Amino acid sequence: MVLANRTRVQNSRTLLRAFGGLNEGYGCSEAEYSAGINFSSRDFPALSTRKPRRKLRTLTGLNGMYHLNGLLTVCGKDLVYTPDDGGETVTCTDAVADSKKALVGLGTKILIFPDKVAFDTADGSVSALGACWKAEGQSVEFAPCDAEGRTYTPTGVGREEPESPADGQIFLKVEDEEHPWRYDGTLEVYSAASGNWTALSLDYCRITAAGAQEKFCQWDTVTVQGTAAKQAGQWEALDGDCVVYAVTENSLCVRADPAGDYFYGTLVQGTDAAQWTSLDGSQTRSIAAEQTVQLERRVPDLDFVTECDNRVWGCSSRENVIYACKLGDPTNWFSYRGIAADSYAVTVGSDGAFTGAATCMGYALFFKENTLHKLCGTKPSDFQLTSLRCRGVAKNAARSLCVLNETLYYLSPDGVMAWDGSIPTKVSAVLDASRLANVQSAVGGALDGRYYLHISRTAGTQGQTRLLVYDTERGLWHEEDVCSCDMASTGGQLYLWDGQALWAADPSRESDWQSTEGVEQQVSFELVTGDIGQDGAEQRYLSRLTLRLDAACASTVEVALSYDGGPWETVASLTAREARRSYDLPLVPRRHSTLRLRLRGKGQITLRSLAKNLAAAKGGLVEEREEATWQV
């Protein structure tokens, strides 16, 4: 009898030296971990615990923070600014309302919405973006004038000029003597040098209002309301948006096209009545004033703001309009003079509310949950809006938007996305999608090529918050203990707020990096590997497992094993009392089909390698059935 040759299962030894990251899916391998806290890929291919953080100062009631030449924190109603150059801290009390803020930088100023104020990092001042003046108990005078705000008093009115005029004499030449003050008349001035009459253009209105000149500047766009000019027959369209062309000591000069039967006159409007007087003072009229005169430089209500090409762009979840301020001027949002520096506004046709705004690759981007709107161009005349139906920013996740290495990362209803200028791609396939959905808040930050994402699914509920870290260079996810209800990236540092204090993610990057005050002494960590033993179909068992660990400081490690999905059994522990030491932890597990490994402890460790000794088995590790019935 001849027996067939059968390949013998040999003993083998494998060494795992390249470790992955967090994988919450079914396909979690032995080089990854299915659950864990406070590990990072900073020493890849080894697996190390994160760096200790440093507590900078106690901080409560934080409504937002932003970095621009220093760190600005909005605490309750107060603004606190700490310059990077070590200058004196600036505090502005009762500067804003006690509510969550949307912050954006432009030049040296940090704009704060919805309060519509600006904090100047250069001088520490706070100023309002908008302005409003009301004639409460005051009289306002309206008079036609030239571009420089000058008014004129004619010495005569008629169809023909006087025969012997004096040099500089003013005359009003009319077309209809029954309506001498109508707008189609011509105001002229005589020049003795040339012997000719020259027409004076009165295409502007001088508004004399005490205190108004202090609130507005030249080239501001001001909304004028409540005037009796139309009822007086002086201007048809004075009420509305007007450009301020000149500002004097007590008046403003705005553009207003001549109109009406009583154009050539002065209108003085009081609380409940207005009086019109002709330019030569020969005729007066009384008109009822139903409203109070108001001058306002408007700023739209914006929920999401971003800066792109020296303009602040914004949108609101309550309307389908995208706004851009005047070039370099965040105080003017409705300036339409037909020049390249004009403001800009466009209505979009997509359904749903806006959920976020950001700037990336030179584009101003506006998101809805299922749409991306991209604006490109250099001036209003060539701005172009393109729309893409894709996975956009999830509701309540506007602050998850973060640009890192020329790529925009954000939380969508389907997971974490990356946009590099084309189509968003999902980068969170290894994470549990159900734990990324229906968030109450999401905040993003960046440091050293790592994207930090804080997620809160149920406000105020313990255990429903996570701090996920994505290594964008290696495509690995990790999770850290929650210390980031709010974040602010500086490019070289990441500041985190845990609800009670402000922390620095990397203490070595602080100006006083030598100080150890506030630095975490012990970092708690935990790691659960994927199933070990799924990489081969032969009947072999794990006879020996050796862990190679490095301790960067005094640390403790507890090792536990779970056989075939059973309970955890502690099999080894390690106490490292010296820094910069390497340790080998040999483990001899009992026979099993699959095995999971758990590391738990405090300190700073690095998992360098994992060595597996596999031995041949005689069967029985995995249930075998000789007969199987297949149904198609």
Positions of PLM-derived features:
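N-terminal beta-propeller domains
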Residues: 1-86, 141-149, 297-374, 455-469
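Beta-sheet repeat architectures centered on beta-propellers
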Residues: 2-68, 393-396, 403-407, 414, ...
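Small/polar beta-strand repeat architecture
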Residues: 4-8, 130, 186, 190-218, ...
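Conserved positions at the start
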Residues: 62, 100, 107, 302, ...
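Short hydrophobic/aromatic-rich beta-strand motifs
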Residues: 71-73, 108-112, 162-188, 218-225, ...
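Short loop/turn segments that connect beta-strands within the blades of beta-propeller domains
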Residues: 75-77, 106, 113-115, 183, ...
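Short, surface-exposed terminal/edge motifs of secreted or surface/virion proteins that either
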Residues: 78-81, 116-132, 169-201, 233-236, ...
